[in-house]
Amino acid sequence: MRKWRLLALNKSTQIRRMPDAIFPFYNEYLMKQQFSLRASVCLALATLASSSALAAGFQVNEHSANGLGRAMAGQAAKPENASILATNPAAIGVFKEAEFSASVSFIDPNVDIDGDVSYALGEAPVGQPMPAAEDNIADTAFVPGFFYVSPINEKLSAGVGVFTTYGLRSDYSDDFGALHFADTAEVKTVTLNPAVSYKVNKQLMVGFGLNITYAEAEIGSGVSNTLAGTVAGLAPTAEALGITLPTLTPGNSLFSMEGDDWGYGWNAGIFWQPTDMTNVALSYRAETKLELEGAVSSETPVFPINLNQPGSLD
C-alpha cells in the first residue's frame, strides 16, 4: 500500500536584520550620495550572481515541518518523509514504498531600515543629512514545496522535488529618503530536483540529483519626495552654472531592470546507518549560476552627462 503524507503548515521568520550596508544600482545622476544603513534587505539581490545563495540570509530551507521543529538540525540524516530529497538524495533509498510530501512555509519577515542620506554637488555638501528610515519593507510570502520518492528495486530508488531555495521581495514608500538607491526588489526562483539513490549495502547509500532552476528578478530605484525637493532646490544654483535640471516626479522610477534565466546544478549525498540507532550523512549542493537577461527602463529624464556618477551592484 502506498503511504501519502501531507506536512503541516510551517510558520517561520525568514529574514532578520542585516549588517550595515546598502547598494547603489544605477548611475547617481546628479550628486554623490553618502548613505549608511544599519539594516538592508536589498543586499540580497547580490545572490543572483552569488555562488552560494543559501549564505545570503534569504534562503528558504523550510521544506519539512518535522525539520522546522528541530531548527533543521541534522536534516540530511533524518529521512522522516520525502522532503529529505532536498537535503540528501542518498537518503531516499530508506523508504520501502512510495511517499509524497507537501509543505507550505509562511515567511513573515521583519526588516526595518534606519539611516540617513546626504547630498553633494561636485565635492560641496548640499544641506544637512536627512533621515532615511522605514519599517517593514519586506512582504510576507507563502512558499510551497512538493516531493515524491519511490523504490524502483531492492538497490535503486528515485524521486523528484519542486521547491525554492531562495527569494525575496522588498518595497519602499515614496517617503523613503533613499528611494534613489532602492525602491522595489524582487527575486523569485523555482527548482526542479530529480534524484536517484543507490544502495551499496544494507548500511550505505549514495545519491545524486540534478537541479534545474528558473529565476526571475526585478530591481529598481525611484524618485523620493526628498530627492525631488532637493533637485528643485538646486535648480537655481545649477541654472547659474549653465545647467538645466529636469523636474522630478515623486514615485517615478529612476531605474528599473527585470530579467530571467535558467540555471543548472547538481547535488549529491551519502547516507550511512552503522547501527539501528545511528545515522551518518554527508550532502553537498553545487552552485547554480544565473545570468539574468531582460529589459531596462526609466521614467526620469537623463541628467547632464558631466553630473553622472558610476554605480554598481556587487
Language model regions located:
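Short, often N-terminal, low-complexity regions
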Residues: W4-L9, M18-F23, S40
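Long, low-complexity, polar and repeat-rich extracellular regions
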Residues: R5, P24-E28, N61, A71-A73
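Short, Lys/Arg-enriched N-terminal segments with co-localized hydrophobic residues
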Residues: Q14-L30
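Gram-negative bacterial Sec-dependent N-terminal signal peptides
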Residues: M31-L54
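Outer-membrane beta-barrel porins/channels
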Residues: A56-A71, A120-A133, T140-D314
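Transmembrane beta-strand segments of Gram-negative outer membrane beta-barrel proteins
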Residues: F58-G74, G93-D112
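Outer-membrane beta-barrel pore proteins
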Residues: Q75-P79, L85-K96, Y148-E154, G167
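Glycine-rich loop at the start of a catalytic domain that most often binds anionic cofactors/ligands
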Residues: E97, D114-L121
